[in-house]
Amino acid sequence: MAFVRSLLGAKKILSRSTGAGSAAPKGFLAVYVGESQKKRYLVPVSYLNQPSFQALLSKSEEEFGFDHPMGGLTIPCPEDTFINVTSRLQ
């Protein structure tokens, strides 16, 4: 039951952005997630302090350096892995 509540909470906080070019609201950061097809997500900036999110950022740095192909922060992991990690950060 806790897992279901965790997923529902993640859906509220971790939202998929519909406008790929739109600016992120104050307090949020747009990231592109996926291996072949990238999807844009908005995540709270507070995630930047979390070790598990920092691990995703390190993976991104190793693969892309500071040259991100989408023009924004790209996290090269499967979408379900990203959702799993971020759902634990609430």
UniProtKB/Swiss-Prot annotation:
It holds the Pfam family Auxin_inducible. It comes from the Eukaryota. It is a peripheral membrane protein. Induction: By auxin. The keyword Disulfide bond does not apply. GO terms for biological process: auxin-activated signaling pathway. The keyword Membrane applies. GO terms for cellular component: plasma membrane. Its main location: membrane. It is found in: Cell membrane. Keywords: Auxin signaling pathway, Cell membrane, Developmental protein, Growth regulation, Membrane. Functions as a positive effector of cell expansion through modulation of auxin transport. Belongs to the ARG7 family. This is Auxin-responsive protein SAUR24. It comes from Arabidopsis thaliana.
